[in-house]
Amino acid sequence: SKLRLVVGKNSKLLHKPYLINGNEKKIAFDSKLFNELTLTKLFGKLNLKFIPMKKNLLDILRKRNNHKIVRKFYSLEKSVTGEDYKKKINKVKKFLRNRKLDLIFITAPENVAWLLNIRGEDTAYSPIPNSYLLLDVKNNLFLFCDTKKIDKKLSKKLKDINIIDIIQTEEFLKKIKNKKVVIDQLTCSIFFQNLIKKNNIIIEKKDPIYLLKSIKNKIEINNTKEIHLYDGAAITKFIFWLKKNYGSSK
């Protein structure tokens, strides 16, 4: 039988006769790519046993043919964001203090991008930099990313942040003990969730950054209005071209 899996906000299993019929099935999976909520939603009612792979076979193949150009991260100016990253960090620290929590492990890269006012070119047509961030209530910050993507200029801007190569994330998290650590089940993988849970108390909460970044400041609002004008002009030009050239050979 063919198995088709759609992963995302509306994750679902489209064809599953093989999994439904018969005895317990063992499925190998990469625990760094799935969160607990998604697996429960997809397979919760099926007789399955998931076996985490030590190494993702696709990653091994990809490394053999990995000759891509390293594209640097870059920062956005305050004239664009309306707020520097230190003020944003203080808001997250306040969230931790008010709930008497020690740490938050931010695993949604788009939220790391917003918090630190940084962007990247890791994925085509997306400015999101692949990264994680660990922030504690005492103002210690650890950015996990490909360190080759951080140039001297950006490193200077983020001088208050410890930048650690993303391949060291596992070893670093193992050292954290006896803390109350916030994770978002929608974005934190099973691998990291289990790793943190070994020596700490897991607090499952929605990443507070989703709410924080939804509240726009005056500069963001004004920039959105200005961009809307450029966007409207571009659409108008396209519609004009389409009407003028519809049916022609162009």
Predicted feature locations:
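A composition/biophysics-driven feature that prefers long, compositionally simple stretches
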Residues: 1-249
